[in-house]
């Protein structure tokens, strides 16, 4: 059985007996984050089903935006676009950027990604097309805590983010679940 077949089979069993606390939710209200909070965090697999209980959040409480290294790469990158929807359409009033110790992005470089892409058959022309952006993204990430400071600063100074939105920065330990306050938004 392939992975996608396994996922679909699991989903069929799940849907045959869904949790009752999910099926009775109001469709409109369930899209709005109850805590009026958006979280920008990493896509690391160790955070799945671990970060949420460590924060005391559950389904319907917050909007969670994940990417490699919880990076903000531009004034209108996909993370900022998601935050704009969170703020202007869904009522978010606070943002927390959560980095984590032992983040793989600290060891990722544009060179390592370029070599891997070329070895998997991506053309040199395609890599050259994105090389500037790739360098700026992958080579800028040096240390997870510095990246949290950087991401918070980019959100706070973004001309599209209202000044009344509080932006905080936390570090999370993927083995202990411990949170550390890095930046307290005012």
Describe every region a protein language model picked out.
Residues 1-35, 70-79, 87-92, 105-186:
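Divalent-metal-activated hydrolytic enzyme cores
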């Amino acid at each position: 059985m392939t992975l996608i077949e396994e996922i679909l089979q699991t989903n069929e069993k799940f849907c045959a007996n869904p949790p009752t606390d999910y099926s009775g939710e109001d469709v409109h209200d369930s899209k709005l984050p109850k805590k009026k909070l958006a979280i920008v965090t990493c896509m690391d697999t160790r955070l799945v089903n671990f970060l949420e209980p460590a924060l005391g959040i559950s389904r319907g409480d917050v909007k969670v935006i994940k990417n490699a290294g919880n990076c903000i790469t531009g004034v209108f990158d996909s993370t900022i676009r998601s935050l704009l929807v969170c703020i202007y359409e869904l009522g978010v009033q606070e943002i927390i950027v959560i980095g984590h110790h032992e983040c793989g992005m600290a060891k990722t470089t544009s060179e390592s990604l370029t070599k891997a892409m070329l070895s998997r058959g991506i053309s040199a022309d395609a890599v050259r097309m994105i090389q500037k952006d790739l360098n700026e993204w992958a080579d800028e990430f040096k240390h997870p805590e510095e990246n949290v400071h950087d991401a918070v600063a980019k959100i706070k100074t973004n001309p599209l983010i209202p000044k009344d939105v509080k932006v905080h920065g936390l570090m999370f330990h993927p083995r202990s679940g411990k949170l550390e306050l890095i930046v307290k938004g005012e």
